[in-house]
A protein has these predicted regions:
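Gly/Ser-rich helix-loop-strand patches that form or flank binding pockets
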Residues: 1-3, 9, 102-154, 235-283
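Small/aliphatic-rich secondary-structure junction motif
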Residues: 2-60, 160-224, 240-244, 283
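Generic hydrophobic alpha-helical segments
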Residues: 30, 97-101, 183, 233
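A short acidic, glycine-rich active-site loop
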Residues: 61-71
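Phosphate/nucleotide-donor binding subsite
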Residues: 70-94
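Charged docking surfaces used in two-component/phosphorelay signaling
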Residues: 91-100, 224-230
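Intrinsically disordered, low-complexity Ser/Thr-rich linker and spacer segments
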Residues: 151-163
C-alpha cells in the first residue's frame, strides 16, 4: 500500500485466524478498525480441526458488538449491515495456511491485514512454512501484527481504544514517510488525546524531508541512538510504554514471508505493543 493508499479510507480488512484464545485480541482490533472505517471484514478460518459446519459461529461478531454497546441484544445481520459493516467468513482452501492467505490476497486484494503474533515466534503458530518468494514479494499489503500477550490499543471487552503513545522507527532506506502518514491517520481515527508520536533514529537520519502532520493534541518528539536499531526500537517501546509501533518494511521483507532475522521480524518477536507494518513503495 502506498502512502496515498494508506491515507485513503480503508474499505477491506482481512483477518486470518485459528480462533484460539491467543487470537481474540487481534480479532478485537480487526473488528474495531472495520467498524471505524465502515469496511468489509473478511475473516479466514485457518484451523482444519474445526468442523466445516461450525466455523461460521466464530468469532462471534454480533455478541461482541453487543458487549461493546454498539448493537442491542438479539440483533440481526441487518443491524450489522446498518452499521456500514460487512462481514465475510471463509475457510482456508489450501492445506497450508500461508498458501491459502496468498491465494486469497491474490484473488481479493485488501487494504489492511490483521494478524495475531506470538512472543518468541514472531508469527502465528500456523505461519511457519515459507511461501514461494516471488509470490510473497508481490503481496504489498499493510499489516497490523497484534501480539497475543498484550492488550493492544483496543479493549477486547469494551471496544474502547487507548492510543496515547506511538513509536515510529525512522530511516532513509526504506523511506519513512508512509509510516508517518499512517501514524497520523491512526492517531486521527483512534487516538485518545493527548498523543505523543516519537521518532526513533537508529543513527543520524535526516528528517528534514519528512512531512509531520500536525494537531493541537499531538506532540512530536525525537530519539537518537547508535548501534543495533532493533535494540533501540524495542528499548524505546518498553521505556515509553508505547501503544503501537508504526514502521515501513522493505519490499523483500514481505509481510507474508518476512526474512528470518530481518529488522521487522526481530521487532515482532520482542515488541510489547502491536506493530503496524507499511510496505515500502515499489520503485
Amino acid at each position: 500500500m502506498t502512502a496515498a493508499d494508506q491515507a485513503a479510507t480503508i474499505q477491506r480488512i482481512f483477518h486470518p485466524t485459528d480462533f484460539s484464545e491467543d487470537s481474540h485480541v487481534a480479532f478485537a482490533h480487526a473488528l474495531k478498525l472495520a467498524l471505524i472505517h465502515r469496511a468489509e471484514l473478511t475473516i479466514m478460518h485457518v484451523d482444519p480441526t474445526v468442523a466445516p459446519e461450525g466455523f461460521e459461529d466464530f468469532p462471534r461478531v454480533r455478541p461482541t458488538l453487543t458487549q461493546w454497546g454498539v448493537l442491542p441484544e438479539n440483533s440481526s445481520k441487518a443491524d450489522v449491515a446498518n452499521l456500514g459493516l460487512g462481514i465475510r467468513k471463509i475457510r482456508a482452501l489450501a492445506a497450508d495456511a500461508k498458501q491459502a492467505i496468498v491465494h486469497h490476497l491474490t484473488a481479493s486484494p485488501t487494504d489492511l491485514m490483521v494478524l495475531a503474533t506470538h512472543q518468541h515466534e514472531g508469527f502465528a503458530r500456523w505461519l511457519h512454512h515459507p511461501v514461494a518468494e516471488p509470490v510473497s514479494r508481490e503481496m504489498q499489503v499493510a499489516t497490523l501484527f497484534v501480539p497475543s500477550h498484550v492488550g493492544g490499543f483496543v479493549d477486547r471487552a469494551t471496544g474502547k481504544t487507548s492510543l496515547h503513545r506511538m513509536l515510529l522507527p525512522i530511516s532513509t532506506d526504506p523511506p519513512s514517510q508512509p509510516a508517518v502518514d499512517a501514524a497520523g491517520k491512526l492517531a486521527t481515527q483512534l487516538g485518545t488525546p493527548p498523543i505523543t508520536l516519537t521518532l526513533v533514529h537508529a543513527g543520524e537520519e535526516d528528517i528534514d524531508g519528512l512531512h509531520l502532520p500536525q494537531n493541537d493534541s499531538w506532540t512530536w518528539t525525537q530519539l537518537f541512538g547508535k548501534g543495533d536499531p532493533v535494540e533501540w526500537i524495542l528499548a524505546a517501546g518498553a521505556e515509553f510504554d508505547v501503544d503501537v509501533i508504526v514502521m515501513v518494511t522493505k519490499g523483500q521483507d514481505s509481510v507474508l514471508d518476512l526474512l528470518r532475522g530481518s529488522t521487522t521480524e526481530r521487532i515482532l518477536r520482542g515488541a510489547r505493543a502491536p506493530v503496524l507494518a507499511i510496505p515500502a513503495p515499489q520503485v
